[in-house]
């Protein structure tokens, strides 16, 4: 099997061949740290986290770089409004970003450079562009002259003439072309600045990623990722300035994730549907958010709504439910090595599903990281495994039946972990779910446990009318009770 990825640059799916065999150099544009991160940031972070995990699963040695933009107009405005400095604002929101990412199970990249710590490299690239006559100084600012770069527009598929005709760029008489973009901004009162050959100032946004990508990964590297909103102008401008300066291709494969809509509308503060990651995690389990993101192909748009999150929640609960049932009813005792014939004899179809999962999972993920299809493969095995368990009613499984069930559960979990899913024990996930969802009932966990204990006592006393009354009373408040040989469990909804 061979990994294929969709390359935005060529508009086609291509075999992935890294520059150096066995090694992958991978850069993703990080957040601008002036506010809390939103659900769109969560999608991008989760998508590229899974790509990072899968590349390592395939055996690649991956160097993953994701930057922080910690100097920007928005950060400056936020600092001025708060009566503090840009560094304090950036540090506050970097810390908040890490908290959100840790909750979502997003691995830390290998390197996370700050833009402010890489300004000398940005100045050097601008100096090269000036020396080549591709950049020009206008007042205290320095601009990139797009007409000096013949390939401008090749990533986004736009023609300069068409862009000019439909341009909604602010008119700046200093520019030679309205689409020329800033490389260096002359200093203004109250703004951070660095010394440069063109006077004190700060870098433009686009030059930051070119400098950090080339510093840590080389002048040409394998993968550059980000949201589709970054294709133009940010990534287009990165290509132009990098290739003009270095004289070689900047990136081999450009990967872009799709947008997140809220109830089928574009997310925006003006529409009042802007959701921070923290807003969402007040009500939704972080692993459910992750499952939701991965249930669609990364290039497709996704719609975030109560309905779609509810579907993700049910799907994740099904997987955990089956794993929990195996753990409860097929617990490993004295390990025995069963022959294939004995295991297959328990359920040939389940045995074959377990054996086929690895290949099916690889086939899905090798097809441009198709996590939706990969999850479908996990659910196919989960359904067969649950049917197998159901054949035994509530009995404990023994011998080869127990071994087969555990093999199925292990296969599901091992492959889910590549996606960063099923990272908890089933009972821990269920407890976390209850803690989140009980808020909507007005009850506390202690009150539910007290009701269960009173009902248990009533049943023990053979006062079944009282036991039924207690059950009906708590179910009216949205709590479902499930009796089992191990005791009574409860869930919300």
UniProtKB/Swiss-Prot annotation:
Q: Name one Pfam family in it.
A: DALR_2
Residues binding Zn(2+), per UniProt: 29, 209, 234, 238
Q: Which InterPro entries match?
A: Cys-tRNA-ligase (IPR015803), Cys-tRNA-synt_Ia_DALR (IPR015273), Cys-tRNA/MSH_ligase (IPR024909), CysS_C (IPR056411), Rossmann-like_a/b/a_fold (IPR014729), tRNA-synt_1_cat_dom (IPR032678), tRNAsynth_Ia_anticodon-bd (IPR009080)
Which cofactors go with this protein?
A: Zn(2+)
The Gene Ontology CC terms held by the record are: cytosol
Comment on bound cofactor: Binds 1 zinc ion per subunit.
Q: What's the top EC group for this one? A: ligase
Which residue ranges run through the membrane? none
Residues holding ATP: 269
Q: What is its EC number?
A: 6.1.1.16
One MF annotation (Gene Ontology) recorded for this entry: zinc ion binding
Subcellular location as annotated: Cytoplasm
Any keyword Phosphoprotein? no
Catalyzed reactions per annotation: tRNA(Cys) + L-cysteine + ATP = L-cysteinyl-tRNA(Cys) + AMP + diphosphate
Name under which the protein is recorded? Cysteine--tRNA ligase
- Identify the species of origin: Syntrophobacter fumaroxidans (strain DSM 10017 / MPOB)
